């Protein structure tokens, strides 16, 4: 093998060994054994919510183990691959180089995953998107962002559960709430929190003028029973109404949609995508619990910031700009990471932004 190839493989081995140490593969195997034992308990499904959490944790742990084991196998096979390729000729060597580049990207992604060590990072993600300034274009932009995150989830074989979509009168969404279910989706997507800005020629403007639109993205961890988020029923006002679709048209003949108002905090949650009022209420309660957990965490952070004399991060500020006209560029304003292919980004190709955001957050935390 060429000395440069040997040096690169040695560097990849060092990085992967660090990942294996951080993940603690043997502890992960023990955790899987423990969860499999719980999952085999005949009485597990007496508590369906707890059972779903156990099976979800087991699935996440198994996926993480498979991923890191597969990386080790691929890396260990690289010297053999190069040995065979050098016997076959330049085309085979080029294929080996391509596999090495792919492996390098995958190990880098695993390295980023090891940076997700927060208390809730391994949870599923609950995403709220709200259209901001920009009228009909902003509503359309909110819907484009929702599609972007769902496409990202699909590319990673993650599950998506839509709780609520509030459509605007002409086009697009006023707001949307949905969960992305997969290992570390909250930790990964939490760097998406903030204001997203779109600049383009408006498809809704007969004069073809350029329009700037804004949408706010909120990312929360999905609440589990261990979080002990208690909600007093007397603190909740429940309103029911008919589900509506695009243009405000009713899509249900019964009052199945649910709106919950948490009176002490003023938090309002709606859910209309389930088939029954009961299902919508259960889903709305999950979202409300996630929002109350976020309030609790925010209060705790404020107390810590006060002790440290730290003003804290302002996630409400603009964090990414998507320019479709007069040039094409998507740029993260925190990390400076940018690409000139907005179409791919809006189709869910956001891993580069996520990895850069996670590295940036770790750097910020270390310097705080």
UniProtKB/Swiss-Prot annotation:
<dbReference type="InterPro" id="IPR045853">
    <property type="entry name" value="Pep_chain_release_fac_I_sf"/>
</dbReference>
<dbReference type="Pfam" id="PF03462">
    <property type="entry name" value="PCRF"/>
</dbReference>
<dbReference type="InterPro" id="IPR005139">
    <property type="entry name" value="PCRF"/>
</dbReference>
<keyword id="KW-0648">Protein biosynthesis</keyword>
<dbReference type="InterPro" id="IPR000352">
    <property type="entry name" value="Pep_chain_release_fac_I"/>
</dbReference>
<comment type="function">
    <text>Peptide chain release factor 2 directs the termination of translation in response to the peptide chain termination codons UGA and UAA.</text>
</comment>
<protein>
    <recommendedName>
        <fullName>Peptide chain release factor 2</fullName>
    </recommendedName>
</protein>
<keyword id="KW-0963">Cytoplasm</keyword>
<comment type="similarity">
    <text>Belongs to the prokaryotic/mitochondrial release factor family.</text>
</comment>
<keyword id="KW-0488">Methylation</keyword>
<dbReference type="GO" id="GO:0016149">
    <property type="term" value="F:translation release factor activity, codon specific"/>
</dbReference>
<dbReference type="Pfam" id="PF00472">
    <property type="entry name" value="RF-1"/>
</dbReference>
<feature type="modified residue" description="N5-methylglutamine">
    <location>
        <position position="249"/>
    </location>
</feature>
<dbReference type="GO" id="GO:0005737">
    <property type="term" value="C:cytoplasm"/>
</dbReference>
<dbReference type="InterPro" id="IPR004374">
    <property type="entry name" value="PrfB"/>
</dbReference>
């Amino acid at each position: 093998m060429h000395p440069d190839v040997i040096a690169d493989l040695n560097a990849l081995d060092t990085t992967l060994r660090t990942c294996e140490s951080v993940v603690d593969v043997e502890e992960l195997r023990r955790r899987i054994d423990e969860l499999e034992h719980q999952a085999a308990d005949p009485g597990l499904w007496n508590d369906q919510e707890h059972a779903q959490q156990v099976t979800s944790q087991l699935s996440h742990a198994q996926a993480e183990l498979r991923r890191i084991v597969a990386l080790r196998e691929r890396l260990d096979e690289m010297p053999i691959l190069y040995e065979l390729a050098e016997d076959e000729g330049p085309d085979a060597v080029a294929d080996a180089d391509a596999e090495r580049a792919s492996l390098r990207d995958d190990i880098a992604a695993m390295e980023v995953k090891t940076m997700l060590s927060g208390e809730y990072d391994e949870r599923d993600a609950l995403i709220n998107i709200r259209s901001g300034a920009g009228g009909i274009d902003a509503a359309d932009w909110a819907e484009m962002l929702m599609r972007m995150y769902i496409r990202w989830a699909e590319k990673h074989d993650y599950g998506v559960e839509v709780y609520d979509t509030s459509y605007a009168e002409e086009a697009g969404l006023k707001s949307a709430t949905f969960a992305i279910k997969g290992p570390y989706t909250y930790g990964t997507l939490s760097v998406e929190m903030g204001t997203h800005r779109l600049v383009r020629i408006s498809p809704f403007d007969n004069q073809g003028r350029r329009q700037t639109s804004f949408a706010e993205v909120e990312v929360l961890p999905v609440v589990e029973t261990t979080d002990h988020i208690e909600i007093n029923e007397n603190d909740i006002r429940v309103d029911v109404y008919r589900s509506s679709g695009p243009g405000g048209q009713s899509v249900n003949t019964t009052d199945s949609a649910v709106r919950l108002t948490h009176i002490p905090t003023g938090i309002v949650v709606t859910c209309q995508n389930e088939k029954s009022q009961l299902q919508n209420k259960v889903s709305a309660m999950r979202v409300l619990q996630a929002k109350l957990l976020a309030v609790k965490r925010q209060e705790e952070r404020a107390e810590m910031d006060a002790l440290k004399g730290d003003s804290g991060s302002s996630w409400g500020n603009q964090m990414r700009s998507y320019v479709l006209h007069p040039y094409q560029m998507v740029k993260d304003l925190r990390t400076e990471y940018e690409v000139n292919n907005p179409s791919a980004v809006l189709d869910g190709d956001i891993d580069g932004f996520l990895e850069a955001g996670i590295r940036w957050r770790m750097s910020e935390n270390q310097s705080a």
